[in-house]
């Protein structure tokens, strides 16, 4: 069985489930269905299936429905909820001061694609908050920041299917630049753009197949 050790997940709606993400974070999946989905048990989620089929311990599922990696979301500035914004907030709050992370999973980019967040240009140093409102700068910053904070951590990026090519290409480029891993999902079943039970099974299967081949 693949050993992932202590796992941190940074994601969007695809990785949420009510009661299993930080309080106040928006979710798509509930015990009592409230969205267009048939997923109503946490055991049906892709991430729980992956955890249950590996040697792993979840440190935190820091997933927030509707969020972009960069600071530009559907209504403009989303710097408090964005992937980089909330990760930086957790770091600044000292949450990691007594935590160990062996595997850091980033599953995002879907909302950057859907919200038409600015793509921008690659930036590999000198980031400021103002530079992180575009996707390419933010995704490079995020991967580098994680690696700097957790030397030797295994960073696994997951990208959705059917996104703008510049979103997928940008994540692939950033992963290659910093030695992170990338899983590119294929042909996932969805309802209203979100994986249903079958889609969750497909994501878990593709992730587990990737892990077992490494």
PLM-predicted stretches and their roles:
Residues 10-11, 62, 158:
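Short hydrophobic segments within beta-strands
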Residues 8-10, 105:
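Structural motif
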Residues 11-12, 109:
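Active-site glycine-centered loops adjacent to acidic/histidine catalytic or metal-binding residues
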Residues 25-120:
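Conserved SGNH/GDSL esterase-like catalytic core that processes O-acyl groups on lipids
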Residues 8, 40, 185-188:
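Catalytic phosphate/metal-binding cores of nucleic-acid and nucleotide-processing enzymes, i.e., regions
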Residues 14-15, 199:
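Short active-site segment of divalent metal-dependent hydrolases/proteases
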Residues 82-214:
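Alpha-helical cap/lid subdomain in secreted, periplasmic
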Residues 3-7:
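Extreme N-terminal starter segment of soluble prokaryotic enzymes
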